[in-house]
Amino acid sequence: MNTEYMDYCFKSIKRRKKNIIKTSFTIFIVFAAVTLLILIRTNVYQWQLQSVKDRFGSWFVMMCGSDGKENSELKGHPYLKESGKAVKVNNVYDNGGEMTETGIGYMTEEFIRLGNISTEEGHFPQKDDEAAVDWNTLLELNQGSSLGQDIVIRTVISDENGQTEDITRTYKLAGILKSYTNSWAGGDRVPGVIVTEQAAKDIKRNNNAIYIYTVDDYVNDYEAIYDGLKKKTSSSLIYNSSVYEYEPWSGGNIYDYMYMIIVLVGIAGITYQLSVYSTGRKRVY
């Protein structure tokens, strides 16, 4: 081994020690910044996505069908996981006897969980004379928003002969739910006045049911899966685009700009160190 050459190399490195340290530190800072940005991007996206699911539900597709007749294609589909059901037994009628779009019915615990439906005040109905109402529906009813107050619901039921009868039910406002009827895709199909299953049966006129399904975690081509599901069912199928087409921060472009800025700063720092080193060499020689 040429010891003189090695000594020369070590002396050269020692002489340029400050420049080498500065350049290495600049490169380290750039890599650390990029790594930190990747971690921030992942965590922020997960936080934003969870916030969206809290508002619009964790469900993937919603099917409007009949109570007791869940679509077998969806129920046994390999890409779909859990399901929940809400039953709209009747429509609310206004004081003039006109039917409104507001529905009354009940929800299963699975539907409440998958829809991330929660109470802002109070609780879900526990007794047959209690009702929980989402905020949007409560505003439409225009009967007040104090827990424990009476909520008067007018509906129409039919007997076995097809004869209709106007009936009025009074419920105690047990809970106020965060709005979903005016924010979800297909939220207008979901009953906004929630009562117990038994109370719903007492005023049942319709046999309408809404089923929601979640998708497996490993699936990422959501739109293609949705298109495939539509071809397998003749029922009305609604896609939760608010969640599964969600793009945080303008589709992630802001992160691309941040990457570019960090890389440019790194290049500028390294270029500066090289220019300082080159100037130092000229002075020596």
For the regions a language model picked out, list residue spans one by one.
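Short amphipathic alpha-helical coupling elements at transmembrane boundaries
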Residues: 7, 11-15, 49-53
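Cytoplasmic juxtamembrane interface segments
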Residues: 16, 194-202, 279-285
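Short, membrane-interfacial amphipathic segments enriched in basic
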Residues: 1-7
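Alpha-helical architecture
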Residues: 14, 28, 120-121, 132, ...
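Hydrophobic alpha-helical transmembrane segments of multi-pass inner-membrane transport and secretion
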Residues: 18-46, 250-285
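Basic-flanked hydrophobic alpha-helices used for secretion and membrane insertion
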Residues: 42-248
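Conserved acidic
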Residues: 1, 36, 167
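Alpha-helical scaffold elements within enzyme catalytic domains, especially in hydrolases
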Residues: 12, 73, 228, 276-279
